[in-house]
From Swiss-Prot:
Keywords on record: Acetylation, Eye lens protein, Glycation, Glycoprotein, Repeat
Recorded family membership: Belongs to the beta/gamma-crystallin family.
GO BP annotations, alphabetical order: lens development in camera-type eye; visual perception
Protein name stated in the entry: Beta-crystallin B2
Pfam families in UniProt: Crystall
Organism: Bos taurus
UniProt-annotated glycosylation sites, renumbered to this chain: 11, 48, 68, 76, 101, 108, 120-121, 140, 168, 172
N-acetylalanine PTM positions: 2
Domain description: Has a two-domain beta-structure, folded into four very similar Greek key motifs.
Site annotation Not glycated: residues: 18, 42
InterPro entries per the UniProt record, alphabetical: Beta/Gamma-Crystallin (IPR050252), Beta/gamma_crystallin (IPR001064), G_crystallin-like (IPR011024)
Role this protein plays: Crystallins are the dominant structural components of the vertebrate eye lens.
Length: 205
């Protein structure tokens, strides 16, 4: 019987996730290194996240403990102060984190106007879309089906506003991916930088 978990030939081995949280801006003050999920940052001895250094990622952080509230996606790199990781500038609170699994070279996502995958839809394959309106899709986004890859949806065009992590699976309504209202106006891939592919965009009604 064939295994579903056979490794793909030539597939890069993911690095162990590693993120360092500093209490002060610009990587100063008390710090704590994480290599796995952290449901409550304060339990590590870090009172407040002032800056973040991602050495191997990606990660998703949350405004509240136990992975609740506003979401913040962290990819490998430096985040010297809170407004470098929030695209909404609504809160400077970062209370829990977990690594994001990126296990697919291909990326395919379908966004639907209505809950339960109905109404007008837009399909995106191996591409980032900074503005749905510019591509002729002006409807709300009430449900999402991620066929492959890991994505970040944004409330506004240009990757601004609230962020929504979209991992492989079905989201029957906007609450399933943490959106207070069915508004997603841009989307991008989270990529393992060892993979690069040219994108293709397929609007459909």
């Amino acid at each position: 019987m064939a295994s579903d978990h056979q490794t793909q030939a030539g597939k890069p081995q993911p690095l162990n996730p590693k993120i360092i949280i500093f209490e002060q801006e610009n990587f100063q003050g008390h710090s704590h290194e994480l290599n796995g999920p952290c449901p409550n940052l304060k339990e590590t001895g870090v009172e407040k996240a002032g800056s973040v250094l991602v050495q191997a990622g990606p990660w998703v952080g949350y405004e509240q403990a136990n992975c609740k509230g506003e979401q913040f996606v962290f990819e490998k790199g430096e985040y010297p102060r809170w407004d470098s990781w929030t695209s909404s500038r609504r809160t400077d609170s970062l209370s829990s984190l977990r690594p994001i699994k990126v296990d697919s070279q291909e990326h395919k996502i379908t966004l639907y106007e209505n809950p339960n995958f109905t109404g007008k839809k837009m399909e995106v394959i191996d591409d980032d879309v900074p503005s749905f309106h510019a591509h002729g899709y002006q409807e709300k986004v009430s449900s999402v089906r991620v066929q492959s890859g890991t994505w970040v949806g944004y409330q506004y065009p240009g990757y601004r506003g609230l962020q929504y992590l979209l991992e492989k699976g079905d989201y029957k309504d906007s609450g399933d991916f943490g959106a207070p209202q069915p508004q997603v106006q841009s989307v991008r891939r989270i990529r393992d930088m060892q993979w690069h592919q040219r994108g293709a965009f397929h609007p459909s009604s």
